[in-house]
Each structure stands twice: as C-alpha cells, then as structure tokens.
C-alpha cells in the first residue's frame, strides 16, 4: 500500500506510517485560529484544516508535500479536455504573460496577485483555456462576481458552455465546459466523492476569503490537479493567509502595487463639530471604542453628510466629466446622500449595493453619481469610467476601493483621478486611520491637498521630502548615542511626521452648524445582534 497519495480530498497519508511525534505535529500545526486584538471580547474558536478517515490523514497538498515530501502517486483525475473548437480570443499584456509563465513553472498550482484593473479574471481564463485546456470550475463568493465571470468568458472564449453550481442547481454534465460555483453552496452541501472529477482545473476567485473557517471548507471539497488562486490582497490581518497557501501553494506571481502616479489627487476635508450627538466617542464598559457604533454615529449625523455634499457639488458642476463613487459602511448613509444630491439638482444617481440584480447594477454603472458600500467596491466592481471617489466613512485599508477609479490606463484618461477624503478630528481612532491612509497615498505618489488651504499648496509642494529620497534628513524623536534606532522610535517618528503634516487649523470653508436640539428619546442598543448559526454539512458522502 502506498504511503502517500495526492487525492481530490487532499494529500492522503497512512496513519500507520506516522510516528506519534508526526501525528502530534499535524494536529497542532494544522489547527488554526485567527489573530485578534487584545481588546477583542469574543471567543476565538480554533478550527482544523485537515480531515481523517480510519486509516489516513487528508492534509493540505502544499503543506504536506513540503513536510513529508512528494506523494508516491497522484490519483487526481486530469479532467476532460475542452472542445478543440474553443479558442481564447484575448491578447495578453506583458505582466499577464509573466504571470502565466510563473504559474506554469510552479506546476499549475499557486496564487497570482494582481492589483485592481490588472486583469485577474482575464489571466484566470487564459490559464484555464489557453495554458491547460481542461474543463474547469470557478469558485466565487458573490453572485455579481459570477455574472462578471460569465460575461468575460463569453467575450474571450466565444461558444463556451457555462454552467452554474448554486443552490439546487448543479451544472456539471458533459454539456458544460465550465461551471461557476458559489462558495456558499459548495461549503453547505455534501457532494458524493467523484462529483467534480471531470474538472481538471479549479480557480478560486478572491482567494483570500478562503482563510475564514467556513469558506476554508471549499479547499477540502474541490481539489483538482491544477489549482489557481486569484487575489489583489493576499495578506489577511487575522494571520490566516496560510490556510489557502497550504492547499494551493505559494504566491507564484505578484504585482504588489501600481507604479507611483502623481496625477492622482487627494483632497482632504477636515470636519470639526462639537455636537455631542456626533463628537462623543462610544465606548464599551472597558473604555474601548466600539467601532460599529462609531460608524453608525458618524453616518447618521446629517450635518456632516450635508457638509460633504456642499463641498462636492460645485466640483461636479464645474467638471461635468467627473464620475463619482461614494462609499459608506451604511446603506442609510447612502440614502441621505441620494436625497441631498437630488435636492442640489443632480438626477443621474444610482445605487451599487448587495442584493441588487445584475441588470440594476449595470444601470447604476451608467450614472454620474454611484452610491455603493465598501463591501461591494472592495472586490469585483468594474466600472472603467469612474474617476472620483468619496470615502464617506473612515477606514484604514482603502487600496481596493481606490483601485475602482484607476481602471483606465494613465495615457487614456480624460479626467485626472481624484480621491475625496474626510478627517473626523473628534475621534482618536479616525485620526489613526487617516495616518494609515496618508501613508498609503504617499507611497503611491499621490498629491495631497487640504480643502481649507490655497489650491496651489500641497504636502508635496510644501517642502516635505519623499521617504525614498536619500538626502532626506529626519530629526529623531529621541537621541541616544549608545543605542541604534529601534523599530519603536521609527514608528513614533512616523506618527509625529503625520501629525506635523496636518496644517494648523483655520476655520474651514465648510463647517457644520449645530442642529436644533431634539426631544430626548430613549435609545435602545442591543450589543449582541443574534445571527443564525450555519449547520455544517459533512465534507463527503460515502457509500
């Protein structure tokens, strides 16, 4: 009996061939838990990324191959060939050719990381059809992504037959060349062993989601001979990127960030208001900021929303070529924006939020002002005409969101991209998030200007030297002749530089007026919003 075999359930190794120390290592190493802040009050539950039968352990392919060595055999089916009549009609850009070559050299298993607008979907289709040529399955986590893959497949591979795996629907017969599967369906249903044997390739779109406990089950349910993960953001803040890397393999090709682009402008409005309805930081019993309540508070404060509209409306009138994407964490906030812009005479307004049908999303994509949630804009939004974005609620990581207005090539732009940012000065957390956004803007070479400064001044033109400039002499925060600079002092210097870069406060051109006091109403806050717990389906059905 062979000691180790690559199977559609994972790297299968005999228990009898393992020592007690090796078994202990498997169980310890492959039981993971997310990293959480020290202030996290919930329960962190570890979960396993391996399964076992009475005789074998089934382990993630890449991890086990590294730890135990190559398997004795590969029992994964090669998959059915695609019809010879199908032809990939796209033209690869140089970086896409490099990505495919790296994927091929890695044995058709690994992760490709490309920024927003660099053609991840295009590259994935080329890999499956042009490079491998076997029937393939694409796993997505949102329905609008499935629709985007469908449209791209039809455009690039005319005549391709596309099936779906969603809910009760399971199009995997020989009449389909490719199936697009919803990951929620894959993780919640038990499929008989061999169900997906006709597929030679699996593509996991937005693969970083597979680090989560529930979605990670997809890695154990669909395993093909060729496995490709696509993402723009492979690093998870909870430290669980290793979960999908253990199954798919390492990152084989990555463009971490776009080249610096000083044509992208950042306009920052400093919002100052001492109304306690807005300015009092919500905290828990330990005095820690409750972020969800803080976002609710900021989004619900209508004078702030009105100030933003008053700031932006003249720009849209003066520059009719601007196409604006407004992002918020709260749908009610977007509705307030829609009402206020309509009152200003803007009629071309559309929503881009979860739950909308693709036809309605396509209609919204034609509007001058698009109101969307961060969740929808973080992945898959493809509206090349967008050139302006308003970050209406504070966030730290905005790279994916900003990428939505940078899909056009620099030489093809008719309007320079513009990011509209807002600094909520009342909150320490918001100031910290601004520091991270500013660091991102600086790393991208964007020009930062404040709304209450003269138009011809900016951070870069005010004499600040770039961090990459060798001659930039920085005054240390502390001087210690006996000790080298530490990471701590470097971080403190960055904070001081960020605070120093914020211009001294002058009465802003736009300032909220304190609303008339309203009758006091009893507020009811339920800190525990109950959710339904999903019943886990068995991984496999065996006779």
For each predicted feature, which ranges?
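Conserved RecA-like P-loop NTPase helicase motor core
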Residues: 354-444
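Conserved Walker A/P-loop ATP-binding site and its immediately adjacent core
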Residues: 121, 130-155, 329-334
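Walker A/P-loop
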Residues: 107-128
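Post-DEXD/H (motif II) to motif III coupling segment of the RecA-like Helicase ATP-binding lobe
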Residues: 200, 208-267, 441
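Conserved interdomain hinge at the start of the Helicase C-terminal
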Residues: 286-329, 336-339
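A conserved SF2-helicase RecA2
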Residues: 246-266, 399, 407-467, 482, ...
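Conserved helix/coil segment N-terminal to the catalytic DExD/H
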Residues: 167-201, 212-217
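Conserved helicase ATPase core of P-loop NTP-dependent helicases/translocases
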Residues: 147, 163-174, 325, 335-342, ...
């Amino acid at each position: 009996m062979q000691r180790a075999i690559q199977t559609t359930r994972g790297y299968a190794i005999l228990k009898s061939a393992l020592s007690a120390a090796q078994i202990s290592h498997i169980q310890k190493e492959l039981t993971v838990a997310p990293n959480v802040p020290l202030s996290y009050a919930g329960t962190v539950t570890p979960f396993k990324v391996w399964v076992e039968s009475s005789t074998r352990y089934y382990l993630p392919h890449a991890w086990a191959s590294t730890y135990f060595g190559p398997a004795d055999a590969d029992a994964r089916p090669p998959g059915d060939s695609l019809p010879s009549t199908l032809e990939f009609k796209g033209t690869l850009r140089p970086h896409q050719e490099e990505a495919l070559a790296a994927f091929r050299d890695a044995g058709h298993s690994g992760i490709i990381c490309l920024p927003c607008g660099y053609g991840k979907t295009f590259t994935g289709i080329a890999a499956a059809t042009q490079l491998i040529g076997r029937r393939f399955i694409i796993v997505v986590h949102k329905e609008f992504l499935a629709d985007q893959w469908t449209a791209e497949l039809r455009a690039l591979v005319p005549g391709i037959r596309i099936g779906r795996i969603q809910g009760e629907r399971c199009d995997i017969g020989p009449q389909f060349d490719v199936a697009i599967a919803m990951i929620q369906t894959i993780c919640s249903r038990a499929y008989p062993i061999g169900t997906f044997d006709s597929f030679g390739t699996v593509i996991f779109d937005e693969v970083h989601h597979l680090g989560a406990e529930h979605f990670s089950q997809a890695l154990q349910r669909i395993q093909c001979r060729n496995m490709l993960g696509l993402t723009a953001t492979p690093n998870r803040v909870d430290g669980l990127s290793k979960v999908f890397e253990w199954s798919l393999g390492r990152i084989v090709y990555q463009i971490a960030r776009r080249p610096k682009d000083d044509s992208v402008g950042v306009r920052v409005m400093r919002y100052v208001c001492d109304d306690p309805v807005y300015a009092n930081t919500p905290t828990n019993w330990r005095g820690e900021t409750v972020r969800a309540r803080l976002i609710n508070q900021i989004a619900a404060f209508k004078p702030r929303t009105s100030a933003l509209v008053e700031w932006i409306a003249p720009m849209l009138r003066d520059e009719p070529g601007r196409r604006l994407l407004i992002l918020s964490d709260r749908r009610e906030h977007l509705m307030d924006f829609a009402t206020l812009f309509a009152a200003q005479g803007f009629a071309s307004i559309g929503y881009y939020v979860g739950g909308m049908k693709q036809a309605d999303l396509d209609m919204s994509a034609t509007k001058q002002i698009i109101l969307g949630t961060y969740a929808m804009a973080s992945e898959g939004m493809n509206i090349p005409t967008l050139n302006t974005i308003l970050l209406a609620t504070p966030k730290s990581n905005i790279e994916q969101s900003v990428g939505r207005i940078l899909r056009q090539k620099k030489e093809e732009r008719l309007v320079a991209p513009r990011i509209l940012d807002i600094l909520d000065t009342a909150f320490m957390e918001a100031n910290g998030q601004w520091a991270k956004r500013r660091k991102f803007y600086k790393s991208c070479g964007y020009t930062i200007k404040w709304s209450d400064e003269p138009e011809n001044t900016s951070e870069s033109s005010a004499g600040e030297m770039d961090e990459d400039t060798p001659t930039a002499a920085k005054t240390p925060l502390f001087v210690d002749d006996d000790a080298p600079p530490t990471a701590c002092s470097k971080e403190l210097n960055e904070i001081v530089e960020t605070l120093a870069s914020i211009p001294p406060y002058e009465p802003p051109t736009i300032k909220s007026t304190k609303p008339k006091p309203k009758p006091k109403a009893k507020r009811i806050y339920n800190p525990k919003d109950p959710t339904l717990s999903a019943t886990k389906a068995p991984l496999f059905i065996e006779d």
